[in-house]
């Protein structure tokens, strides 16, 4: 998720400059293909043709993520053209991982567009000699054929204040099914499962719950989650940045609405994360 597209099209000149400044070798860059668009975004392709973001919207999702926003739909020819443009530009820069945010919000009810979109990304990457992986936040989708389109599926773990996870396929404290993708009903049909502390900027999400724990409890929780999911042949992604509810009351990063493990801020989880990766 190094390249974020939430409510904002990717600025490839800025991305190129930032990638050039990263000195560490063999870094794998990823692009997050977000389920949120700004209908008034001013953005054009390399020939100067401007995209019409209003045409990309699911008509029933006006202002769903704030003023002038919507959820895009794969059924829009304009949106598919935009996706082709940004994914190809990213591949040209060497981006190797593409993840669709909450793909069930972008897909049609027939789920018949993802195969075409994914095939185009893979074919272009192959033509350019770039190895890519494609993932998605697939929610409660259990269609084995659909899940098999992706190299990985990704979602939150659903922790409580003790750092424990539940046993069911859906988080019990939500009315609709907030899918726990580590559950066999999903994981058993996917090629790979990546898990993280989910964040949406509300007090009951994974990251806010985590940030309210003591430093010792946070370290223990990360170690337990990492050890458990790796033992289940799944990946657990350590929290390096995320959005918090600014009234959360726990530790935070550079501002109250952001989490950071850096020792420069109040959470100071950096050493605990490093120790886990080093097997200490």
Q: Could you tell me what each predicted segment is?
A:
Residues 1-280:
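Glycan-processing catalytic domains of CAZymes
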